[in-house]
Amino acid sequence: MKLATEKKTTRQKLSIAGMLITMGVVYGDIGTSPLYVMKSIVEGNGGIRNISQDFVVGSISLVFWTLMLMTTVKYVLIALRADNNGEGGIFALYTLIRKQAKWLVIPAIIGGATLLADGMLTPAVTVTTAIEGLKGLPINGNVLVSNQREVIILTVTILSVLFFIQKFGTDLIGKSFGPIMLIWFTFIGAIGVMNLMGDLTMLKALNPYYAIHLLFSPENKVGILILGSVFLATTGAEALYSDMGHVGRHNIYGSWPYIAACLVLNYFGQGVWLLQHKEVAAYQNMTDFNPFFEAMPAQLKIPAILLATVAAIIASQALISGSYTLVSEAIKLRLLPRIKVDYPAKLKGQLYISIVNWILWAVCLAVVFYFKNSAHMEAAYGLAITITMLMTTILLFHYLGRREKRWFLAYVVLLFFGAIETIFFIASAAKFMHGGYVTVLIAFVILFIMFVWYRSNSIKESNTFKSSTVSLLAYKRQLHDLRNETSLPLYTTNLVYLSKPQAEPRGKNMVKKNILYSILDKRPKRAQVYWFVAVNVTDEPYTAEYTVDTLGTDYIVSVQLYLGFKMEQKVNIFIRQIIHEMIHNGELPAQPQHYTTIPNREVGDFSFVIIQEDLSPETQIRAMDKVIVQIRLWLEKFTDTPASWFGLEYSDVFVERIPLVLGRQKAINKYHLKRRQEES
């Protein structure tokens, strides 16, 4: 049976409006790369005084082929086809193949952790780079930003405002993102054409020979490490894949050629400008110039900087929203603790996670204050995302081979792109000592939390006593008698317990013994209907289905909810829908209420019991496993409450604490008490 939900349409057909939305949602990161890619390449080689024609042509060739191979071929042509009901990204890919091998969770959590870590650096890099364009630039005779300190203040202000407005939703301003990004791409493409017309010989950079030649040329003073800067041109490719569910694959197919053309034209235009100005004395000793801004007419610089700032904000917004989505997916897949997820806008796909928002804000500001300028940030940027891309390649290999049975393509992806990404990783690893350790540290913290959460789930499942799970059939008679025991007060009309999903068919109608203990032993709870509800997270993103088994009664209901990994788990709403359907179908009797404000009310009151586990001192498992479980229980103190997570904030909820006993229970019978004989 299906549940009534407001499902977000993830597979949109190709349309002008769809492609416009795509420009605002998908291309923010990769679209702002021209702000710092060539700047980073030139600075890495010692400045404009150390570049030559071969160096510039080779650099542009490296950027071009990186965009073509990594973004166009791997992600647009191959990865976008590996979708989970229209959803993309590393976790969506993982859900497609996780049943094939348990170890695939390793590349999934590593890739997810590094993608989140990289997303924390992106807003700081893009906004700082854009604002630096204002430094020393006269506006109406006055210099608005005269030094780096003022750049930092303005950057921090913009980022703080951006993060502050997240809780109110961004759907209103989000409607303008697409048109603004269309203007941005058209503008940078036009500037590129204008410069390229000055020296069409730059088109020889289309030949990959110049890219390969530069890697081994003496003109290149950093050797293969130049790829650490080149890689910045494609860091947004992973975000492109992750955001597929918001806009649809076909809208990316339709819009990418235009986006790619504008990016390539701008890079080529910057290359021409560098060749034409490498001998200009004014630039010889400049250490912080940006060829992106220098390559345009003076009268366009101020509009360009303002437009770049807005584009950087849009790119940052896309990364922030992407982080919310990534965390939400990880929670549903039981890879991260449950934390409160809000939906501030009318659009169901727009999330807001308060704790994630403020952690991102704090990290972004810390990055700005620590690195102080974009050059230092660029030195740290990109290392984490190379790891994400490698992990995606591993998962793509298993998807193409094991699921699609296209083994030739699978090995091409693994060997070809795996080799390229390994080289990029080696080149980017040199950034570790220049600030790359920041993103590695952030990624490690996220990875540690993911590992603890995933591993503790495995420990609990493998060490819980088999006797801790019982069949409802064995207690059917007792529940019947308790229901009809008039000497006990009616606890509630509908008593609902959230139980753990059990494997079918052996686990059918099986629940944890502590649930029956709560009903029968701890304090007998008399109710008209006993509900045992299990939430199963499916590999599809927007599944909303359920099954029921009444065990041939009208007082026991075993419900299995099947919800997609992107669905809200609003149990209260779903249970009320189910009981109305069951009463309408004659599976349950009506529950008329004598005292009510609702005319013709058929459903009685609900009480929800949530059982909270505390690690018992009687637990006997390996010391390391015990530490992991204890860390998990500590983390749970900072997570969302089950009542909030399951949409029960305004329901009648009771929390019962029970000991969590794992492994073999300590024998206490060997300690036999002997009664003392009292002296007469």
From Swiss-Prot:
Name of the gene: kup
Biological function: Transport of potassium into the cell. Likely operates as a K(+):H(+) symporter.
Sorted UniProt keywords: Cell membrane, Ion transport, Membrane, Potassium, Potassium transport, Symport, Transmembrane, Transmembrane helix, Transport
Annotated Gene Ontology cellular component terms: plasma membrane
Species of the source: Latilactobacillus sakei subsp. sakei (strain 23K)
Name assigned to this protein: Probable potassium transport system protein Kup
Organism placement in taxonomy: Bacteria, Bacillati, Bacillota, Bacilli, Lactobacillales
Primary location recorded for the protein, binned into one broad class: membrane
Membrane topology reported for the UniProt record: Multi-pass membrane protein
Catalytic activity from the UniProt record: K(+)(in) + H(+)(in) = K(+)(out) + H(+)(out)
InterPro entries: K+_transporter (IPR003855), K_trans_C (IPR053952), K_trans_N (IPR053951), Kup (IPR023051)
